[in-house]
From Swiss-Prot:
Catalytic class of the enzyme: transferase
Family named by the database record: Belongs to the class I-like SAM-binding methyltransferase superfamily. TrmB family.
Name of the coding gene: trmB
Catalytic activity of the protein: guanosine(46) in tRNA + S-adenosyl-L-methionine = N(7)-methylguanosine(46) in tRNA + S-adenosyl-L-homocysteine
Record-listed S-adenosyl-L-methionine binding positions: E45, E70, D125
Protein's UniProt name: tRNA (guanine-N(7)-)-methyltransferase
Record keywords: Methyltransferase, S-adenosyl-L-methionine, Transferase, tRNA processing
InterPro entries in the record: SAM-dependent_MTases_sf (IPR029063), tRNA_(Gua-N-7)_MeTrfase_Trmb (IPR003358), tRNA_methyltr_TrmB_bact (IPR055361)
This protein's record includes keyword Transferase: yes
Residue numbers binding substrate: K129, D161, T201, E202, Y203, E204
E.C. number(s) listed in UniProt: 2.1.1.33
Amino acid sequence: MRLRNKPWVKEYLEKNDKYLISWDKETKINLSDLFNNKKQPVHLEIGCGKGNFITNHALKESDINFIGMEKEETVVGVALKKTLAEFEQRNKEVTNLKYFNDFAEDLSDIFAPSSIDKIYLNFSDPWPKARHSKKRLTYRTFLDIYANIIKSHGILEFKTDNDGLFAFSLEEIAENKNWELIYQTTDLYSDIEALKNNIPTEYETKFHTAGKNINKLIIKKTF
């Protein structure tokens, strides 16, 4: 996600850096050093946007530690501001959510093997041109990377409004021995059971309101 530059963001992030994850690019992040409750599972959202999804998950699931990953500094600032406001409104302290303002093509450079319990991919860039297919976050090499950093039998959830990207993702998963498809739908909002625990992203709300179908799949690591 890209937003216009907001002059207040840099100073705001510096002031609230305890909610940010620093990475020296030389060593992997030690997840046990990030949160007060070190024994809680860790869920990672890759491309967290303005923070609605991960903020509401963190509010709802205090027994889980969350990481929101986003490479655009302005977006991280907007997301963190939303998080702090939502928690403050409920008189809660943010203890189970941190933001990571960085990115690496190979997440194995950042996270140790089998260190993440669950991964969320929400409305990722579809990279519609065929020559850019390797940049799609559900391309086979990315699926292999996720399988490396996620724990045994860990879960990955993926939502998108882009039907072409969804079809592509299903094909990639079908050919990848590391993952088993356990749920899929091309119309999430017609699945009443699935909606019970659904937390929408900003894009999701926008597209659904406009009448666009929302695709979702869930895969499980096979080992």
